[in-house]
Amino acid sequence: DEWKERGNVWDYEAVFHDHNLEGQRPLLDSINTFAEIIQNNGYKTAFIGKWGLGAPDTEGVPNNQGFHYFFGYNCQRQAHTLYPTHLWENEKKIILNNKLIPPHSNLEIGSNPNNSNSYINFSLNEYAPELMHRKAVEFIESNTDNSFFLLYASPLPHVPLQAPIKWVNYYRKKLGSEQPYTGKSYFPSQSPRATYAAMISTLDEQVGDLVALLSEKNILDNTLIIFTSDNGPTYTGGVDGNFFNSAKPFKAEYGWAKGFLHEGGIRVPMIASWENHIKKGSVSDHLSGFQDVFLTVLELAGIHHPVETDGISFVNTLMGLEQKEKHKYLYWEIPEYGGQQAVRMGAFKAIRKNIFKNNLSIELFDLATDIQETINVADQYPKIIEKAERIMKKEHRKSVLSRFRFPAFGE
């Protein structure tokens, strides 16, 4: 939630001069976060990257939510440029050597999109992902003798399309000439495919650096690394998901990828690495969600957490053992793009769309035979639809914010 009651939160110049317009509505202090639990059990904790759970000077800043150290964006909107005017270190605003180019700016009128000089304004001096990476390295180096937890929420490869020139040139040679993206949203790019690939390679290189550092410090076999994403690929800002098969075997276009509850939007890779503990190259089809990381990590750390959560530990799956405890179902709900609910029950996936348009009908897909969710089999399985309906009703919570409430539900 952008917390628009504060003023024009989309005026980037105003936000730069008044941090009270920055950030999102804060996570309540009464919420006991995973970071607070692990911090209270002797771990050094850090959040590096993009934070959107509490604006500056609120109870929601990372330092108030269980993190000893924070470096990065404290605002989702500010992360719409990878060359920001500032970042935050703990609760201190760090001014960078970048002039303000408001996110979503386009090429100047009359500019030639095929001339590299037209894009000079969009490649500045201090690249946020590089600054964050250095801080991640510093945190690990300063805690090699401590138990530590690092949540590294890299802004890569989120648009806008901005990447180190060495990688952009590498992919320009591989991909050849291409149609420029002239910036209908986010920023323009002369070589959008090459730049997107460059962003991925930058992230890959940074992850490799961290793994090498853990090995160099002789703590790799005592460190669990989990690499995953918060959503499927985007289709905006010049990103060509279909060209890269970004969601394969799912669909990567609007209506099916990021922001939507089809598989292309919510099913993401999850890679876990723990030297000498997790079998290399092993693969699991265990049905899981990010809420399960909570209890999994606590179990591995030997931390007892008595409060009931939605997650289950998947330690046995990581270790190649039988996963006795499994989800009966997974549930998703988002107010964006018309309002959506989804339930995954075994091979079946139920989706309700356009709730704000008073739609209450539910589509049903058999993922075992229709992974792209193209054949609605709701009429064939009325009892499964009834079950999905009960789950949606049980799991839904009326939003505290009126604009997120569904009138179709009598709210």
Residues covered by each model-derived region:
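Formylglycine-dependent sulfatase
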Residues: 1-363, 371-398, 402-411
